[in-house]
Protein backbone atom coordinates (compact mmCIF):
# COMPACT_ATOMS: atom_id res chain seq x y z
CA UNK A 1 0.00 0.00 0.00
CA UNK A 2 1.47 3.35 -1.07
CA UNK A 3 0.57 6.80 0.19
CA UNK A 4 0.51 9.56 -2.40
CA UNK A 5 0.25 13.25 -1.49
CA UNK A 6 -0.95 15.57 -4.28
CA UNK A 7 -0.62 19.31 -3.66
CA UNK A 8 -3.08 21.69 -5.33
CA UNK A 9 -4.18 25.30 -5.29
CA UNK A 10 -7.73 26.38 -4.64
CA UNK A 11 -9.49 27.47 -6.73
CA UNK A 12 -8.07 24.69 -8.86
CA UNK A 13 -5.82 25.74 -11.73
CA UNK A 14 -4.77 23.94 -14.89
CA UNK A 15 -1.57 22.96 -13.04
CA UNK A 16 -3.68 21.57 -10.20
CA UNK A 17 -5.65 19.40 -12.62
CA UNK A 18 -2.45 18.04 -14.20
CA UNK A 19 -0.99 17.30 -10.76
CA UNK A 20 -4.13 15.41 -9.70
CA UNK A 21 -4.10 13.45 -12.97
CA UNK A 22 -0.50 12.38 -12.32
CA UNK A 23 -1.39 11.32 -8.79
CA UNK A 24 -4.29 9.26 -10.11
CA UNK A 25 -2.12 7.63 -12.80
CA UNK A 26 -0.21 5.60 -10.22
CA UNK A 27 -3.16 4.89 -7.95
CA UNK A 28 -3.98 1.25 -7.21
CA UNK A 29 -6.69 -0.29 -5.02
CA UNK A 30 -5.62 -0.18 -1.40
CA UNK A 31 -3.39 2.86 -1.88
CA UNK A 32 -3.98 6.08 0.01
CA UNK A 33 -4.42 9.22 -2.09
CA UNK A 34 -4.34 12.56 -0.27
CA UNK A 35 -5.23 15.85 -1.97
CA UNK A 36 -3.64 18.76 -0.06
CA UNK A 37 -4.32 22.48 -0.27
CA UNK A 38 -2.36 24.86 1.95
CA UNK A 39 -4.47 27.82 2.98
CA UNK A 40 -2.03 30.65 3.66
CA UNK A 41 -2.83 32.59 6.83
CA UNK A 42 -1.29 35.82 5.56
CA UNK A 43 -3.71 35.79 2.61
CA UNK A 44 -6.73 35.35 4.82
CA UNK A 45 -7.75 32.23 2.89
CA UNK A 46 -10.40 30.06 4.52
CA UNK A 47 -11.06 27.04 2.36
CA UNK A 48 -12.97 24.04 3.67
CA UNK A 49 -12.27 20.41 2.85
CA UNK A 50 -15.80 20.21 1.45
CA UNK A 51 -15.14 23.01 -1.05
CA UNK A 52 -11.86 21.41 -2.09
CA UNK A 53 -13.52 18.02 -2.53
CA UNK A 54 -16.43 19.52 -4.50
CA UNK A 55 -14.02 21.31 -6.87
CA UNK A 56 -11.97 18.16 -7.48
CA UNK A 57 -15.02 15.95 -7.95
CA UNK A 58 -16.61 18.47 -10.34
CA UNK A 59 -13.70 17.77 -12.70
CA UNK A 60 -12.81 14.13 -11.96
CA UNK A 61 -15.98 12.66 -10.49
CA UNK A 62 -15.84 10.79 -7.22
CA UNK A 63 -12.30 9.62 -6.55
CA UNK A 64 -10.97 7.56 -3.63
CA UNK A 65 -9.08 10.40 -1.95
CA UNK A 66 -8.76 12.04 1.43
CA UNK A 67 -8.91 15.82 1.32
CA UNK A 68 -6.73 17.89 3.62
CA UNK A 69 -6.63 21.66 4.03
CA UNK A 70 -3.70 22.87 6.12
CA UNK A 71 -3.37 26.42 7.35
CA UNK A 72 0.06 27.96 7.59
CA UNK A 73 2.33 30.87 6.80
CA UNK A 74 4.90 28.97 4.76
CA UNK A 75 3.62 26.81 1.90
CA UNK A 76 6.75 24.71 1.65
CA UNK A 77 6.86 23.96 5.37
CA UNK A 78 3.23 22.84 5.35
CA UNK A 79 3.84 20.50 2.39
CA UNK A 80 6.90 18.88 3.98
CA UNK A 81 5.12 18.61 7.36
CA UNK A 82 2.10 16.96 5.77
CA UNK A 83 4.31 14.56 3.79
CA UNK A 84 6.01 13.53 7.03
CA UNK A 85 2.72 13.34 8.95
CA UNK A 86 1.13 11.11 6.31
CA UNK A 87 4.32 9.08 5.80
CA UNK A 88 3.93 9.75 2.07
CA UNK A 89 5.69 7.51 -0.43
CA UNK A 90 5.14 9.99 -3.28
CA UNK A 91 4.58 13.75 -3.27
CA UNK A 92 3.32 15.43 -6.43
CA UNK A 93 3.82 19.19 -6.75
CA UNK A 94 3.45 21.53 -9.69
CA UNK A 95 6.63 22.77 -11.33
CA UNK A 96 6.22 26.25 -9.82
CA UNK A 97 6.51 24.83 -6.28
CA UNK A 98 9.78 22.98 -6.89
CA UNK A 99 12.02 26.05 -6.67
CA UNK A 100 10.26 27.33 -3.57
CA UNK A 101 10.55 23.94 -1.86
CA UNK A 102 14.25 23.77 -2.72
CA UNK A 103 14.92 27.25 -1.30
CA UNK A 104 12.91 26.59 1.86
CA UNK A 105 14.68 23.32 2.63
CA UNK A 106 17.99 25.01 1.80
CA UNK A 107 17.31 27.70 4.38
CA UNK A 108 16.13 25.12 6.89
CA UNK A 109 19.21 22.93 6.51
CA UNK A 110 21.68 25.71 5.79
CA UNK A 111 22.38 24.49 2.25
CA UNK A 112 20.64 24.08 -1.06
CA UNK A 113 19.97 20.37 -1.42
CA UNK A 114 18.51 18.33 -4.20
CA UNK A 115 14.91 18.31 -2.93
CA UNK A 116 14.21 14.87 -4.37
CA UNK A 117 17.27 13.40 -2.65
CA UNK A 118 16.44 15.03 0.69
CA UNK A 119 12.85 13.76 0.71
CA UNK A 120 13.99 10.29 -0.34
CA UNK A 121 16.72 10.21 2.32
CA UNK A 122 14.88 11.77 5.27
CA UNK A 123 11.27 10.77 4.65
CA UNK A 124 11.63 7.81 2.26
CA UNK A 125 9.45 9.83 -0.12
CA UNK A 126 9.67 10.21 -3.89
CA UNK A 127 8.96 13.72 -5.23
CA UNK A 128 7.55 14.07 -8.72
CA UNK A 129 7.34 17.38 -10.56
CA UNK A 130 4.35 17.78 -12.88
CA UNK A 131 4.91 19.97 -15.96
Task: Identify what each model region corresponds to.
Residues 90-131:
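Gly/Ser-rich helix-loop-strand patches that form or flank binding pockets
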Residues 61-98, 102:
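Mid-chain, well-packed structural core segment of small domains
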Amino acid sequence: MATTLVTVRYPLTADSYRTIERGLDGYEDGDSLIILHVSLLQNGDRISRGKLQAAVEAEFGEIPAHYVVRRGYVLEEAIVDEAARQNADHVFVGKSKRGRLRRWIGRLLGLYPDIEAELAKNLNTKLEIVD
